[in-house]
Amino acid sequence: MYKKIGIIYHPLNPAACDLAIKLTAKLDSLGIENWSDSAWQADKLTSKMQNTQLIFTTGGDGTILRTAHAILPLEIPILSVNLGKVGFMTELSPEDAISGLEKVLAGDGWIDERSLLEAEYLPHDSAQSRQFFVMNDAVVARGQVARVICVSVDINSQPFTTYKADGAIVSTATGSTGYSYAAGGPVLQPNSADIILTPILPHLGRGYSLVLPSDSTVDLQVNTWHEATLSIDGFINMQVSSGDTLRLRRSSKKVKFMRLRPNNYFYKELDTKLKGNNESVYDR
């Protein structure tokens, strides 16, 4: 029995806000403790997560990414409503939100576990390192000036290559349908723990993606006279300097999704979603 449920919504999507209100009213009518807040206030949600057993999201994949970061290192299941455009990670249509909630409360559903990466940012000047969880991808890329950068790659502490390119992407299986795919990377089955390494527009060569075993460690070192950036899951962004390193490895933590569809849903919907990948502004 669920005793406490959270609702996290996209604050700039009116439909997402309205649905959050309806879900709150439904939970109130059932006498279930609940709370709701904006996905853009994720850093302020820690205290609300205490004893929360399920998180309902109303938005798109971007809302889910922010929610996952807010939940971690806890592993509270996420039940998501697609009010974005593509919704690779979402579970329910807006029309099915209330009935989907009722089914889960009645004991239906199964847990879909997704692997994460842990990223450690190591500045070249020995300043304090920073740690991040990565659900989709970590991207080291050029800045606003249209100049290629060099990204040296080590795999398991052994030199692999240096990309002279717009950057490089390290992706999870969950993120394989995102930026990595757009850069020519493969699509992995979402429960895979493998890691994808993909260059972005490499100079003097087509480049190729590499699928690495789940126990791999990948180091990306920036070498450039120009501006460079680091982006984690598309919303944690910072400038980086020449000599800085990003170290990535698989995390022991998981992100858990509550599913109501059959467990072959990914293959049934993959082709349709990839062909119709026209993102809504509200999916960011």
Swiss-Prot record:
A UniProt-annotated Pfam family: NAD_kinase
Cofactor annotation: a divalent metal cation
Compartments (UniProt record): Cytoplasm
Active site (catalytic residues): 61
First-listed, main subcellular location of the protein, grouped into a coarse class: cytoplasm
Any one GO molecular-function label of the UniProt entry: ATP binding
Enzyme class: transferase
Binding site for NAD(+): 61-62, 66, 136-137, 147, 164, 166, 201
InterPro entries: ATP-NAD_kinase_N, ATP-NAD_kinase_PpnK-typ_C, NAD/diacylglycerol_kinase_sf, NADK
Reaction equations catalysed: NAD(+) + ATP = ADP + NADP(+) + H(+)
Cellular component, GO annotation: cytoplasm
UniProt keywords, alphabetically: ATP-binding, Cytoplasm, Kinase, NAD, NADP, Nucleotide-binding, Transferase
EC number(s) reported in the record: 2.7.1.23
GO biological process: NAD metabolic process; NADP biosynthetic process
PANTHER family the record matches: NAD KINASE (PTHR20275:SF0)
Family: Belongs to the NAD kinase family.
Function: Involved in the regulation of the intracellular balance of NAD and NADP, and is a key enzyme in the biosynthesis of NADP. Catalyzes specifically the phosphorylation on 2'-hydroxyl of the adenosine moiety of NAD to yield NADP.
Name of this protein: NAD kinase
Source organism of this protein record: Dehalococcoides mccartyi (strain CBDB1)
Taxonomic path: Bacteria, Bacillati, Chloroflexota, Dehalococcoidia, Dehalococcoidales
